Swiss-Prot record:
It comes from Solanum chilense. Disulfide bonds join 212-244. This is Acidic endochitinase pcht28. One of its GO terms (cellular component) is extracellular region. SUPFAM superfamilies: Lysozyme-like. One of its GO terms (molecular function) is endochitinase activity. The active site is at 92 (proton donor). Induction: By osmotic stress and abscisic acid (ABA). Belongs to the glycosyl hydrolase 19 family. Chitinase class II subfamily.
Length: 253
């Protein structure tokens, strides 16, 4: 009988790939269709303007466009990333009763639509510059600038813009992805601004100018509440530093 011997170098490469999550399955191995329905059960309520828009298949198709999303690190790290992503986006799109943290993904469009580039989709993408960068990032060029409503009418594009934002560092902000998987190291400026690793700095990345460095507030608590619920469903710890109450926002340096 002939045996194939695997070299130490090959074994080292495989071990590295395992640690970095390269060999991990896609996000669908964590977010099954059943779990997706449990997490976002209110989204198809008759009271939700987004009823029927956010589908499991659209989420998985979009997630598969970003190989690192929900696949990096060990099982706990991967699940925490999913919980954090849905925690933040559920707050952005919430409806239903306050305090229950079950009403995520009820809205696809911002209520105030006075600006052409108003908030749309799971991350509530706003501002022309973000539509332009998102379009370039997901490979549709200027399509989102020319037709921003694609983010509210094409569910795969909608999820892709949200995951693009999540995965992408911008200006002096780290990516939400790097923060939640523990690959962000605060700079001296971050430390001076009380921006520390944890879920709270993700809130700062997304909406720090309106929610952070102003003490406890209902918006921050809502984001934390959704995150805690999803961490419980996935049986993972939330980690520390969940709020941004004393963090300066990134625009303040």
């Amino acid at each position: 009988m002939k045996f194939n011997i695997v070299s130490p170098v090959a074994l080292s490469c495989l071990f590295f790939l395992f640690l970095t999550g390269t060999l991990a399955q896609n996000a669908g191995s964590i977010v099954t269709r059943e779990l997706f329905e449990q997490m976002l059960s209110f989204r198809n309520n008759d009271a939700c303007p987004a009823k029927g828009f956010y589908t499991y298949d659209a989420f998985i198709a979009a997630a598969n466009s970003f190989p690192g999303f929900g696949t990096t690190g060990d099982d706990t790290a991967r699940k925490k990333e999913i919980a954090a992503f849905f925690g933040q986006t559920s707050h952005e799109t919430k409806g239903g009763s306050a305090g229950t943290f079950t009403g995520g993904y009820c809205f696809v469009r911002q209520i105030d639509q006075s600006d052409r580039y108003y908030g749309r989709g799971p991350i509530q993408l706003t501002h022309q510059s973000n539509y332009e960068r998102a379009g370039q990032g997901i490979g549709v060029g200027q399509d989102l600038v020319n037709n921003p409503d694609l983010v509210a009418t094409d569910p795969i594009i909608s999820f892709r813009t949200a995951i693009w934002f999540w995965m992408t560092a911008q200006d002096n902000k780290p990516s939400c992805h790097n923060v939640i998987i523990g690959q962000w190291t605060p700079s001296p400026a971050d430390t001076a601004a009380n921006r520390v690793p944890g879920y709270g700095v993700i809130t700062n990345i997304i909406n720090g100018g309106l929610e952070c460095n102003m003490g406890p507030n209902t918006a921050v608590e809502s984001r934390i509440g959704f995150y805690r619920r999803y961490c419980g469903m996935l049986n993972v710890p939330t980690g520390e530093n969940l709020d941004c109450n004393n963090q300066k926002n990134f625009a303040q340096g």
